[in-house]
Regions:
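Conserved GNAT-fold acetyl-CoA-binding loop/helix
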Residues: 32-51
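Residues at alpha-helix boundaries and short interhelical turns
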Residues: 38-41, 58, 99
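A generic secondary-structure signal
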Residues: 50-53, 115
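A short helix-loop-beta-strand connector motif used in the catalytic cores of GNAT acetyltransferases and
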Residues: 52-63
């Protein structure tokens, strides 16, 4: 299925220190949604570390912002960016309540993909997803990612090693 980018209900931007309060409130509101899938920063100190980690050339973060409400809808991180012959990065992402399940993360993901492929000139983006995370799998599938494989005990999530499916999208597949 060809992913299409329509006039978006969201914008993307880098997080700043001034986002800390709204971000932490969104994390608290969404604890049940994130349980066992992801551990977003949940304290001011953790938020500061997050900003420091994702302010380099190899790790970028984008807040997905609802255009009309101004709320933080979710986060998409572009991490471990490798240049040279690979031109690749890994994606990590999560949404916040009450916006989950409304297609806003899809809109945000398409904007991040466009930025990664057109502005950053990346060739490949990869998302590793726990097999039971059906919403996440549906998101990447709707954005044009292809399932490439399975990695046993791949990432330590919430204190335990978890299996993951490997999904990827190439620059030449985006926007065809």
């Amino acid at each position: 299925m060809k992913p299409t980018l329509k006039p978006s209900r969201v914008t993307i931007r880098a997080p700043t220190r001034s986002d800390c309060g709204a971000f932490l409130r969104a994390v608290r509101r969404s604890r049940a949604l994130h349980d066992s899938w992801v551990s977003p920063p949940s304290t001011p100190k953790a938020f500061t570390r997050y900003l420091e980690r994702f302010s380099s050339d190899t790790n970028l973060s984008f807040l997905i912002i609802h255009r009309s409400a101004g709320d933080i809808v979710g986060v998409i991180n572009v991490g471990n960016l490798v240049r040279g012959a690979l031109q690749s990065a890994y994606l990590g992402y999560y949404s916040f309540l009450p916006h989950a399940g409304r297609g806003l993360m899809r809109d945000g993901m398409l904007l991040v993909l466009r930025h990664a492929f057109r502005k950053l000139k990346l060739h490949r983006l990869e998302a590793n997803i726990q097999p039971g995370n059906l919403r996440s799998i549906a998101l990447v599938r709707k954005c044009g990612f292809v399932r490439e494989g399975f990695s046993r005990r791949y990432l330590k999530i919430c204190g335990r090693w978890a299996d993951h499916e490997r999904w990827a999208i190439l620059a030449e597949d985006f926007g065809k």
